[in-house]
Amino acid sequence: MITKTIISAITLSGCLLANAEASGCPDQYPDGVVPVVRNPPASWNNLIELCAPHGGFVDGYSPVLRVPLYAVEHLTREHIIEHQRNHEGRTDSFRPDDRLTHDQRAELGDYKRSGYDRGHMAPDADSWDEASEYDTFVLSNMVPQAPDNNRELHAHIEGAVRHLAKQDGELYVYTGPVFQGDTQYLHRRVAIPSGIFKLVYDPRTHEASAYLENNVNGPQGQTYTVITPARLTELTGIDFLPGIQTKPLDLPVPRDSGSFGHSRKHGFF
């Protein structure tokens, strides 16, 4: 059973997440608006904000579940172009987050021989240089992800969102886990999500929609639906765009070919 974790100390690089005034990296959120946890289990209280040292993303991290409940990126055309110009191949640097205590964080051993990938929430491919890429490899930016989903559909969704950001100029992208039913754990420590979401908000048009995927192997791990921010709040208990009025965003259909169509489907997971 999960019990509430008491956080006794907060470092300069991680703070209890309560409001925009408390944020250590307000520029990562649209208009500085921090997500609000509306209806969580008691054990989800005390999310820790973990700002990437070199910018680019911020994680809202649960020291109880030992996964981020979301990662937020301010994804820009300039960053994508810089990545394409500078990237010379991925260098894996998976490591525990030393901003957290052992009791609060996931360790490499938690994932060993688990059958799950260490799935990035803020993707390494969204980084623009070696330092920002290195930032993405802390385990506080990971969830246990089914390999078929992580390496195929989810990767294609990431690519589709980059394509849209390059086309539109800038987006705010929220990625995280969904927990439905009885939650399973790696070594009784790291929560395994039943699904993965990626919410995309265009600040220019005030449009937003989310991809929702099954976190499983096989054909079910290759299916997704598109939902509204309100439906995502129902599923996660988190209001990602509090006070922001949005219209549906026409999300691109993820494809492995590099060419992206568009989907106007808005269904439910």
Annotate each predicted stretch with a short phrase.
Residues K4-C15:
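Bacterial N-terminal signal peptides
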